[in-house]
Amino acid sequence: QYYGFELIPIPMDDNGPDMDIVEKLVSEDESVKGIWCVPKYSNPAGTTYSDEVVKRFAALKPAAKDFRIMWDNAYCIHEISDTPDVLLNIMDECKKTGNEDLPIMFCSTSKITFPGSGVAALAASENNLKVLREKYNYEIISYDKLNMLRHVRFFKNYDGVLKHMEKHKKILKPKFDIVLDTLDKELEPAGIASWKKPHGGYFVSVDVYDGTAKRTVALCKEAGVVLTGAGATYPLGLDPKDSNIRIAPTFP
């Protein structure tokens, strides 16, 4: 948006993005240069892309030769369920289809340690890494190696990261349970809204009648409950149906 890109919202279902629309746009229009994906516990509904969706991403035939899939795995280990979702490895699938240059994958510890002072990771093909390294040479002289060392000494290894996430889960799951139990008790009998019960991530997505989300958020604010602005998770902040409300059990 900041750089002048036209942002096109893609409808989502329980399997992820509508791949018929994605494939049509990507294969027919060379001005379509990329797609941004949060493949696990995706905002706002907490959806994890199905195996079929990941495989269809890996098999894309873009009209634009420089088309890239931005695979933002922000919630890769952010579980709140004892039966966490499993996401297929897109790079493995892209290798099978000869599309290794398609995905650029990244994640960070911003929701694990401290936002803005964590550690980020990026994975891509050698071709993509070569381009990215060249650009980073002009952006930063040296990385914050002391912060990297802090994280290594704190976590020690991958098992240490998972053990730390169990502590997050103990804090977050009761909050999610309160929100979901309240929705079940107060709204389900009225039949005026629907929601999903995510296995992870940081949010609960509630869908109300079309054209009423902004008004609902405004009424909640008048009652003393401040919610995330309606449409916040959509490109340009515009929910085409004005029906989605994102609830953050993590705050407070």
Kindly give the residue locations of the regions a language model identified:
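Substrate-binding/gating loop at the entrance of the active-site cleft, primarily
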Residues: 1-5
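Short beta-strand segments
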Residues: 9, 36-39, 70-73, 107, ...
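Conserved PLP-binding active-site segment of the aspartate aminotransferase-like
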Residues: 124, 205-211, 227-252
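Active-site phosphate-binding strand-loop segment of PLP-dependent enzymes
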Residues: 14-85
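Short amphipathic alpha-helices in soluble, non-transmembrane regions
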Residues: 216-222
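Short beta-strand->loop structural element characteristic of the AMP-binding/adenylate-forming
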Residues: 6-14
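Conserved glycine-rich beta-strand-loop-beta hairpin in the small C-terminal domain of fold type I
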Residues: 166-180, 192-207, 221
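Conserved core segment of the aminotransferase class I/II
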Residues: 92-173
